[in-house]
Amino acid sequence: MPQLFLLRRKKSPFFTPAAPIILYMKIMSFSPFGYEGALVTVEVDLRRGIPAVDMVGLADNAVRESRERMRAAIRNSGFEFPVERVLISLSPADVKKEGAGFDLAIALAVLHKNEHPEYGSAKDAALIMGELELSGRIRAVRGVHAALSTAREYGIRKCIIPAENAAEADAFAAMNVFPVRFLTDAFELFSTLAAESEQKNADGGTDCTLGEASDVGINAGVRNRAAEFLAARSDAHASIKDEPVVFSDFPAQLDYREISGQGFFIEALQIAAAGRHNLIAYGPPGCGKTLALSRFYTLLPRLTREEALTVTRIYSISGLLTSGTRILQDPPFRMPHQSSTAEGIIGGGIHCRPGEISLAHNGVLFLDEAADFRISVLQALRVPLEEVKITLSRAGRSTDYPARFQLLLAANPCPCGNFGSTDKICLCRPQAVEQYWRRFSAPLLDRIDIRVALIGSGEATKTQQDGAHCFFSDKQRLSTAQLRQAIADATAIQRKRQGKPNALLNAAEIRQFCPLGEEAERFLTNSARRFAFSARGIHSCIKLARTCADTEKGTHIQKHHMEKAVLLHRNAGGIHMMF
């Protein structure tokens, strides 16, 4: 056996290995799948045979169709398409390649291979994304923000993307991201980047800039546009500040001062916004549920930079970023229709797209007329509310989407809407009312911190004098600006104290950040025994009391804070029969 091995290792007189020639720029692209996606290496080989384009690497139909788009775009851009047989390899081979974002990467790989057929392995890499029109114009693609984030994690600093996606690069000031509109510009840029990489390696690792590669012959206009974009992007990045609490401006007609007769509900919304607590409001039609909840987003401060980047990535993956959108700084507010399916709310599908709960990440998911949603949809909310993420699986692959959303529910008290009203007659049978509320399971309702039972506008003035509403009687006509001030104070306190909203505190953090005074603890114990609160319900009351104290800039949880918290959790309204 050793002699046989030595014979096999002898050099053949008919084969002389060529000296390896290094290609200094590897072409990478991105396959969007779920929240993570995957980087894909694009390689091209030219060989003898009947002229054709072959593609390997588990590509879907959209990627395979890029062969014809790429061929037409190359010819219509003034380049010569190779006369040899073209083999395109997309690796890793076991990852399914999806989407039209590979067009530009494949075209540049073919053109570069046609110009330098002897090149082999590569040291440096560039991320390239874009869909090609037959004219050679480059169209926008989804997932550019996620692609740039993944490329940064793998140390790739050079990227070529469609000009329409240029705004998504603002979050990546440390990377050299070049937006292009036409295939000709992309080829000149890529040739320059490859020459820079070669010069860098020849100089022993010294980095060079775009302007130093003057011997490549790149079009001066392309170089200037790229330099201007990088400078503008750096300035835009420098102007984005992670301020403690900042609010956006909204039209005056969305002011909460316009809502009268529901003072207790307005303060409940203030506390919900300050601590990011889940809330359900139920009452007869026309009492102001939808009116108040639909403008809830005006009470929320802007996202922190870390939160904004995560939200922007999700919307980029979904293809929902409009042209020119840089970083989404306002919390998302999603209001899906009652006909939405579980897949639309939770996410999924062939490509594992994010659902409404992920699109509402770091924001609000508002389900108006919640009882009209499918039971499967309502029950599917339980796990993401607890785990603040959702795991989606498809064809042997899985992905985790963040889903830290604030849930707002609005519902009628019964099918006809008049249950509990003093001036209207409910026509529903007791069995119908019971069946109606069975749609909201106990585990789901237990995850909702604030429960508000509303009354009709005609009864509001009279009921405001009730002792049960003594906490809320002076909040009836506060403006949005006044409500924001207390929310800003509470938000700043929470960020400084624990780095997260009170609603997201776990059991250990509750013990650490929410110590109770003797009177507050005694009142909570008696209330929990009287109203049969679950362990989660007790934690909800403590977190609500912590938020009530924060809105008053209080350092300790007092008894009146706990009284208000129990009232909000028990039902702050005129109907006390639903839970």
What are the residue ranges of the model-derived segments?
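Basic, amphipathic alpha-helical bundle interface domains used for macromolecular binding and assembly
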Residues: A62-R67, P82, S89-G99, H351-C352, ...
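Polybasic, lysine-rich low-complexity intrinsically disordered segments
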Residues: K10-S12, K200-N201
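Peripheral, non-AAA+ core regions of ATP-driven protein-machinery
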Residues: P17-L279, C287, H556-F579
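Walker B catalytic acidic pair
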Residues: D368-E369
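Cationic, low-complexity basic patches in intrinsically disordered or flexible, solvent-exposed regions
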Residues: L4
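P-loop NTPase nucleotide-binding/switch module
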Residues: N224-I271, E306-I357
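Walker A/P-loop
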Residues: A281-L320
